[in-house]
Every structure is written in C-alpha cells, then in structure tokens.
C-alpha cells in the first residue's frame, strides 16, 4: 500500500552515489499510481522536496504527499535543518523524520515536539545509546512512545496511523 520513492540523487559518501533523475522519479510515481501505492517521498535535503513537488505538479505524485525527512546523511541533523524541511512542504502533507545513527533520538524528540511523526528501525539506527545495541525494532518504537507521552503527544493506533497516512 505504501513504498519509498527517493526524490533525488543521494551521495552516501566515498564513491557511493544513488542516482535518481527527474524522469526516474516521474516513472516510479506513475507506476505507484497505476498500482494504487502511496509514495513515501524520502528526501535527504531541501532540494529533494522541491523535486517531489515538481513531480506532483506534473501529476506524477498525488496530493496530499507524505514525506520522510532523512537527516544525518546528505544534510546535517539539527533541529534547524528539521524546521527548514518541515516548513518547506504543503500544509496538507504528512511527514515523518528519521535521524540516521547517532542522530536518531534527538531528531525523534524534535519531530514529536514539532507535531511530526517518527520513523525508527534497524534500517536507520541500531543503537539505543552510545555502544548499546537495540534488542529489536520494538524496543526503539517503545522509546518513541515514551518520548511522545513525555511531550503530551497521543500515540496513534494502527488504524489511526493508516488514516493519518491516507491509507484508510
């Protein structure tokens, strides 16, 4: 029902570059629409937001758009960076944020405080704290639930999450 659509080229460091042209984004967006799949527009910097919006204006991505801001790879992972990303998307968009590695928990807390949603898991981080490996994805989810409660945010049920994401 939902799949990642990387909305631009990403330099992962060293010689590793993931190339995603405007045409590639458009083609994948069209295929997703044909198959009834909602894109999670994964963006690693502000320019990728602009490319996603460009594809949406041309009809390759349907509104409302769901974004996942991935911070700590191509762009630094500061609260300022998160604010720039969150204020650069249409008001009817939904968004999650992910801090890679050591950035995971600070970005999670800032995201919750800003009204966004959090993505956690072994794809992005394996540590609960410096040198302490997470036992499971569930342990990471539980930490985010605790953060949300401390910040007076309600945690969505699976049905509510589907509705928020436009999958209901």
Give short role names for the model-derived ranges:
Residues 2-123, 134-139:
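Catalytic alpha/beta core domains of metabolic enzymes, predominantly
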Residues 49-50, 128-129, 165-166:
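Short secondary-structure boundary/hinge segments and terminal tails
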Residues 17, 129-153:
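C-terminal helical cap(s) of enzyme catalytic domains, especially alpha/beta-barrels
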Residues 146-168:
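Mid-to-C-terminal alpha-helical segments outside catalytic/metal-binding sites
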């Amino acid at each position: 029902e939902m799949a990642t659509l990387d909305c631009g080229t990403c330099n992962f460091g060293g010689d590793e570059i993931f190339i995603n042209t405007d045409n590639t984004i458009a083609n994948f967006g069209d295929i997703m629409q044909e198959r009834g799949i909602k894109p999670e527009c994964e963006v690693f910097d502000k320019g990728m937001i602009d490319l996603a919006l460009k594809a949406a204006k041309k009809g390759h991505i349907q509104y409302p758009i769901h974004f996942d801001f991935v911070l700590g790879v191509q762009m630094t992972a500061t609260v300022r960076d998160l604010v720039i990303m969150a204020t650069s998307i249409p008001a009817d968009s939904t968004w999650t944020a992910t801090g890679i590695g050591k950035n995971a928990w600070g970005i999670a807390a800032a995201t919750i405080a800003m009204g966004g949603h959090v993505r956690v898991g072994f794809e992005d981080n394996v540590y609960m704290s410096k040198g302490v490996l997470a036992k499971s994805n569930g342990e990471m989810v539980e930490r985010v639930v605790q953060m949300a409660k401390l910040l007076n945010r309600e945690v969505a049920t699976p049905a509510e999450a589907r509705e928020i994401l436009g999958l209901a």
